[in-house]
Amino acid sequence: MNTSRKEFLGALSLATAFAGCTTAGVKGGAGAPDIRPTRFPPITFDGLEPKPDFWQVRPSEIMALCERATKCSKKEVICHTPLGYPVWALFYGDFSEPAPQTNWSAGNGSTTYHNYYGNRTDGKQTFLFIAGIHGAEPECVAGAMNFIQLMETGRDFRGKADPKLLELASKYRVIVVPCVNMDGRAISPDHLRGLDWINFRRASQGYWKDGSLVGWRGSKAWFPLPLDKVGYPGGYPNSEGYNIMHDACPGDLRTEEAKALLKLAARWRVDAVLNGHSYESAPSVIRGTSIAVPENVQRSKEIRYECNCALHEAGILPQPTPTPDKDKYSPGININNLLALASGALTLTLENTVSYDRPDKPSANIRPTRKYEFTELVDVTMIVLKAYLANGLKRPFVYRGSEKVYGD
C-alpha cells in the first residue's frame, strides 16, 4: 500500500470515528420558510477569474453540503435569515447531554462551575467554528466548507487528506456554522481575489446612491444601514441592513442570526470560538478583546501567537507576530464578547485575506499583500484550526474545576 493511500485510509477512519451513528438528527428542515428574492441584485465585476471547484461558497452549495452531511452526530438549522435562508450548524462528537440546569452567569456565581458545565466524563472540550458573519467575505466560508468535507469523507474538496487535523478534531466536540450571513453571501461574488481596493469596499460595505463608498468605519455609523439610501448595501450586513458582528448590545439584539449563535454557545457550553472573517492584509489571527473573562484575555494572546507563528512558518504571514508578553488587546465590542458571556468561552477572530495588491501604508500599519492562490486561502483555515486545537490540548481553554476560583 503506498503512502498516500495509507494517509487517506487513516484520515477516513478518523473521520468516521466522529459520528457513532448513521443518521443525523435534523432540526429545522421541515416547514422552513421560502427563500425570498434579494432586494438588491448581486454585484458583479469584470475580470474576476472563475472559482475553482473546491471553492464552495454559494448559498446553494452551502445548503447542499449541510443537507447531505451524515458523519456528524447531529445537525440543526439554528435560525433562518430575513430572506429565509437556513443557517446550519453541524455537530461532530457526542452532544447527547441535557441542557444546563443554569446559565453561565448564574453558574459562575454558584457554589461550583459544574452547575453550568455539568459533569461530562469524556473530558472533551467544545469548539465552535463560525464563518461568514460578513457575507462578502467568502474565504473562511470556503475553509469551513472544506473542513466539513474533510470531517465527512477524510479529504477536503481539493482531494487533500489532513490526518493531523482530523486527529486533533477527534479530541474535541466540534460545532461548525459554515455561513452565518447567508443573505449577504447571496448578493456577493464568489471571491474578490485580485480586486482593487475601491471595488473591494463597494462589494463589502456597499455604496450610497450617489456612488460614494459607505466604507468600513462608515458602515458602523448605522445600525441598521439605511437601505433606502444605498445603491448597494454590500455583503457585510444581512438583508435588513444589520451587521451581525455588532449585534452585541444585551437587551437589544436585533437579528435572529446573533440570537441563534448565542443560544448555541450557551446550550452546548462552548469552550472556545474561532470567528472567521477576511480583510485586506496578510492572513492572521487578530488581537482578542479586553472585555472578556480576565484569564481568557491573556490566554487569547498565547493562542494568537501560536496560530500566527504557524501561518508564518507556512509562508503565509510574512512578518513576525508579537509574543504574548508584548501583545496588546482590542478594546472593541462585538459578538465575540457576547459569546464569551454566553458560555465563558475563549474567543478569537481569524482574518483571512481578500488577496489583492495594494500600496504599503506604514502610517496606517497596513501591510501590502501578495496575491494568494485559492488553495492557500483554504490552507489558512486549516493551519489556524490545527494550531488552535493543539493549544487546547496542552491546557484547557477555560477553567471547569469543581471549586470556585474566587469568593466564598
Regions found by a protein language model. Give the residues of each.
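Short glycine- and acidic-rich boundary segments immediately preceding or forming the N-terminal edge
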Residues: 31-104
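Short, surface-exposed beta-strand/loop micro-motifs that present aromatic residues
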Residues: 88-89, 112-118, 335-341
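Proline/glycine-enriched tight loop/beta-turn segments at coil->beta junctions
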Residues: 96-100, 117-125
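Active-site/substrate-binding loop(s) of hydrolase catalytic cores
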Residues: 124, 138-293
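N-terminal secretory signal peptides and thylakoid transit peptides that target proteins
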Residues: 1-16
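Active-site histidine-acidic residue metal-binding/catalytic motifs
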Residues: 129-136, 140
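C-terminal accessory segments enriched in acidic
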Residues: 3, 24-56, 158, 240-408
